[in-house]
Amino acid sequence: MASLVAVQPVAVKGLAGSSISGRKLAVRPSPRALCRTTRRPRAAVVAKYGEKSVYFDLEDIGNTTGQWDLYGSDAPSPYNPLQSKFFETFAGPFTKRGLLLKFLLLGGGSLVAYVSASASPDLLPIKKGPQLPPTPGPRGKI
């Protein structure tokens, strides 16, 4: 903390002194603040590569930023080999967004075509025709 004391200010060229009720005031740091600033830290803070989950090395940018072309590890697959073979074989064509979108559009279109073709034709009121005899309106007209 700083304490305000009435002392003779040092004239600094280009800076005007502050005046409160005619006295020039200068800011002098408290003795506690002086002690804190003169102390040295007990230990320097050093982050080593890989220590405490801090991974940063300018010499090894590949490991620092990650291998962007590699999305897995070299560990063996935790899945059943038959399951892995199935997904590699049959899900291979759908790895691209465009192919997956085309597959979904074709599947959805064929589903709509099948449902509309297999629906009974008399669902629409125009196909069913009138079910009850017409009732006359308020003036006796149909």
Curated annotation (Swiss-Prot):
Can you list the GO cellular component terms from the UniProt entry? chloroplast thylakoid membrane; photosystem I reaction center
Q: How does it sit in the membrane?
A: Single-pass membrane protein
Under the heading Gene3D superfamilies, the entry gives: 1.20.5.220
| Source organism superkingdom | Eukaryota
The transit peptide region is found at 1-47
Give compartment(s).
Plastid, Chloroplast thylakoid membrane
InterPro entries in the record: PSI_PsaH
Kindly give the Pfam families that the UniProt entry links to this protein: PSI_PsaH
Q: Name one GO biological process term.
A: photosynthesis
Chief localisation class: plastid
The membrane-spanning stretches of this chain are 101-119
Identify the keywords attached in UniProt to this record, alphabetized.
Chloroplast, Membrane, Photosynthesis, Photosystem I, Plastid, Thylakoid, Transit peptide, Transmembrane, Transmembrane helix
Question: Which family, according to the similarity comment?
Answer: Belongs to the psaH family.
What is known about what this protein does?
A: Possible role could be the docking of the LHC I antenna complex to the core complex.
PANTHER family recorded? PHOTOSYSTEM I REACTION CENTER SUBUNIT VI-2, CHLOROPLASTIC (PTHR34787:SF1)
What protein name is recorded for this chain? Answer: Photosystem I reaction center subunit VI, chloroplastic
Q: What is the phylogenetic placement of the source species in the record?
A: Eukaryota, Viridiplantae, Streptophyta, Embryophyta, Tracheophyta
